[in-house]
Design a protein with these regions (language model features):
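Extended, highly charged alpha-helical segments
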Residues: 120-165
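N-terminal accessory targeting/assembly segments
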Residues: 1-123
């Protein structure tokens, strides 16, 4: 199954294990005011709880749009990192979809598992799928979600060409 090879089910833990502690992160933008972001984070917290994680804190930042490198600004990322280190947090869940580069950059900075809303929802479906057909459909959805992220991961090799002279 996909979860065995690609660790797509990052919240899954043994039954007796402590639930993972997570922080939720969202952006207040010109398109989304504070009240709307609070509503989205309430929903995200419910999803995290459904997946088996406990929300320890929420972080928001008011910006014009997501940072292409790390979704949030460097100062906010540092604030989140300090909180994670001080409070035994194992996961950060972002309200919006993240690119593969953003996930890699954020993981490097925060040193915890990074999920976005879509990967969290797919995780919930994977945990609850019972029939072989349902499991296959969830696995297909996970692959479809991963495909563009995996494709963009190798763009750093585009200029390297083989050939003579």
């Amino acid at each position: 199954m996909i979860n065995d090879h690609l660790n797509i089910n990052p919240i899954a833990a043994p039954i007796d294990a402590e639930p993972e502690r997570a922080v939720l992160i969202g952006l207040i933008t010109p398109e989304q005011n504070e009240a709307k972001v609070a509503e989205y984070l309430d929903e995200l917290e419910f999803l995290a709880d459904t997946a088996g994680a406990v929300t320890a804190a929420r972080f928001t930042q008011k910006v014009g749009g997501p940072n292409a490198r790390t979704y949030v600004g460097s100062g906010k990322l540092e604030e989140i990192r300090a909180y994670i280190e001080d409070n035994d947090i194992s996961m950060a869940i972002f309200d919006d979809d993240l690119s593969s580069k953003q996930v890699a950059n954020i993981e490097r900075e925060l040193k915890v598992k990074i999920l976005d809303r879509t990967s969290l929802i797919l995780d919930i479906f994977a945990k609850r799928a019972r029939t072989a057909n349902a499991k296959t459909q969830v696995e297909l959805a996970q692959y479809q979600y991963l495909l563009p992220r995996l494709t963009r991961m190798w763009t750093h090799l585009e200029r390297q060409r083989g050939g003579i002279g």
